[in-house]
Amino acid sequence: MPVNFRTGRAWCAVALISVAAFVIVARAQEPIRVEVRDVIVPVTVTDDKGRFVSNLEKNDFHVFDEGREQKVTVFNHQQSQPIVIGFLLDQSNGMKIHWAKYQEATSELMLNLLPLEKKYSGYLITYGNEPELVVDTSSDSEKMVEKLRKMKPGGGSALFDAIYMACTSRKTIKGEPYEPRRVVVVIGDGHDTSSKKTLKEVIEVAQRNLVTIYALSTAAFGFHTDAEDNLVQMTEQTGGKVETPLNNVYKDISGYLSKPSDAGNYAIDVGTGGYTAELSSAIFRSIANLSGEITTQYVMRYTPDVGEKGVDRQFRRIRVTVNNLPNVTLRYRSGYYPFGPPQ
């Protein structure tokens, strides 16, 4: 039977394409893992009175990855470190009572952390029933302040979806997450009534993207709510902290919760100059604390050396210690994911 060489070549080509397609499909079924080559660890050190300890050097720190000490290759403690910071502003009904105060405080925080220099960038996300990227990543803080002035709260609260958006759906700056490093500040009470994402999911996506989360809690007058635990978990797991300005409004005032009044159980009557001054002072002290912490951190970087036992761990835990300082508190991320999520 005669052989048609052209047809034969075509058949071979089809066969090769089919085999190649099979290999591609087979490989596509495997999870795509992108290894983290370097880990960045911002660290805050405070003494037993909450004051920043700012005179430490590289040799004072020890960084452990899965219990194995690491060699720190980059150490930075300059106050002018490049940073990209996301402002996540609660627009739910719960913000209405003190909206004007937090509106003013957020504007102050934006202007302090983004002084119109290229190495400082930020973005603004609001969240009510759903998150919205109001201003994408930019060095222009005045643009964000202008948008902020026109806002009015109302609706539900999609906090977790807002965190997810901050980590995945904005314009990035060349060099992230190392220079600049990534920070998010949540201004809200921690409630979530509308999100599709869960608390666990957004903590993971923040850890994968090396984002440090801070929060300015708007929960009022020292009464703990379960929603505040959301803020605590997000900040502690990523190396940040929660400021609770309204919890301390009455710390220096006798009679709080023991002097009934028609306007409520306040030691300073609502609507008076004293009440307004205490409230504003507490909020702006918290703003100053956040600004100070973000700009005074020690930033360390290392290439993971975890030995055979730590190679395949899906989540690697970090521990940081300092020499000869027993009464200090260290805040840093709890760990990181060495591989990207399955695709």
Model-derived regions, located:
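Scaffold/interface architecture of coatomer-like assemblies
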Residues: R27-Q343
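Bacterial N-terminal signal peptides
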Residues: W11-V23
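N-terminal secretory signal peptides that target proteins for export/translocation
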Residues: M1-G8
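Short, low-complexity intrinsically disordered segments
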Residues: R9-A10, I97
